[in-house]
Amino acid sequence: MAETDPKTVQDLTSVVQTLLQQMQDKFQTMSDQIIGRIDDMSSRIDDLEKNIADLMTQAGVEELDSENKIPATQKS
């Protein structure tokens, strides 16, 4: 097997390290974007749930222990 030039090994090592760092940076950027979008989606869902609850209150609908809901005017 032919001997490998130490300079070539150092260059290759440097290139691989640079490539890995670039990949890690891109992965971190994408991860941050995904987490930001998940947080945004969570806030939107919370707002939507609040708006639905407000609309139900305005419409006179009250939640029961079960999943069924009836207007407050029909209660005994």
UniProtKB/Swiss-Prot annotation:
Family: Belongs to the HSBP1 family.
The protein's role, per its UniProt record: Negative regulator of the heat shock response. Negatively affects HSF1 DNA-binding activity. May have a role in the suppression of the activation of the stress response during the aging process.
Gene that encodes it: HSBP1
GO molecular function annotation: identical protein binding; transcription corepressor activity
Biological classification of the source: Eukaryota, Metazoa, Chordata, Craniata, Vertebrata
Name of the molecule in the record: Heat shock factor-binding protein 1
Matching Gene3D superfamilies: 1.20.5.430
Keyword Nucleus (UniProt): yes
Organism whose genome encodes this protein: Bos taurus
PANTHER family for the chain: HEAT SHOCK FACTOR BINDING PROTEIN 1, HEAT SHOCK FACTOR-BINDING PROTEIN 1
GO BP, sorted A to Z: axonal transport of mitochondrion; cellular heat acclimation
